[in-house]
């Protein structure tokens, strides 16, 4: 709770709680119901973040199979509901060009399940460039509730000037 003391103007917090852990679509969760309850008591929504860079996984292997995507989606939604979070924030990075269509299909399928369970779906993205066009931001905008562009390089850990690392 002390992290949020004095914070104003914020309505969503997205803790990194879900980590892809193998190539079958399983993940590790470090989510906390108590954290969610505290955030809700402060008027904040909680969107649990899924990442693919904590464990050594092959994202293409997971996304290429309907059964593995279904396993991941079912697990994510069930865990989100068990924790009482308001949404799921997808931060899958370094998705290969070859996996682009499967990635977008995963987002389509996840969006259906999220909507059916009243969960917000947001997707984190690099700044759009030609080399990452396979992330298909137009389609993301159709299926996700929020498409987030991660802007970096404003400040860094050793920077002489304090400030955010992204805006």
Regions flagged by a language model, labelled:
Residues 23, 97-167:
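Substrate-binding surface in catalytic domains of secreted glycosidases
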Residues 32-37, 73-80, 104-111, 137:
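Generic structural signal for well-ordered alpha-helices
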Residues 17, 48-52, 92-94, 123-127, ...:
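A cross-domain feature marking catalytic cores of carbohydrate-active enzymes
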Residues 1-75:
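Glycan-recognition patch characteristic of GH18 chitinases/ENGases
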Residues 13, 90, 147:
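Conserved, mostly hydrophobic/aromatic
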Residues 11, 86, 145:
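Receiver (REC) domain switch/active-site residues of two-component response regulators
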Residues 42, 83, 116-119:
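Helix C-cap/helix->beta junction micro-motif
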Residues 2-7, 77, 134-143:
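Mature extracellular/periplasmic domains of secretome proteins
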């Amino acid at each position: 709770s002390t992290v949020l003391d004095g914070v104003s103007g914020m309505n969503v917090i997205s803790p990194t709680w879900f980590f892809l852990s193998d190539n079958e679509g399983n993940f590790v969760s470090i989510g906390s119901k108590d954290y969610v309850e505290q955030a809700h008591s402060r008027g904040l929504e909680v969107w649990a973040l899924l990442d693919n860079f904590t464990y050594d996984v092959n994202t293409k292997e997971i996304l290429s199979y309907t059964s593995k995507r279904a396993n991941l989606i079912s697990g994510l939604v069930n865990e989100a509901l068990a924790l009482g979070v308001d949404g799921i924030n997808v931060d899958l990075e370094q998705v290969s060009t070859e996996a682009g269509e499967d990635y977008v299909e995963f987002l389509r399928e996840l969006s259906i399940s999220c909507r059916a369970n009243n969960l917000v779906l947001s997707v984190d993205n690099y700044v759009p460039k030609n080399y990452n066009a396979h992330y298909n931001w137009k389609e993301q905008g159709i299926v996700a509730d929020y498409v987030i562009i991660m802007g970096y390089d404003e400040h860094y850990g050793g920077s002489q000037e304090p400030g955010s690392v992204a805006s």
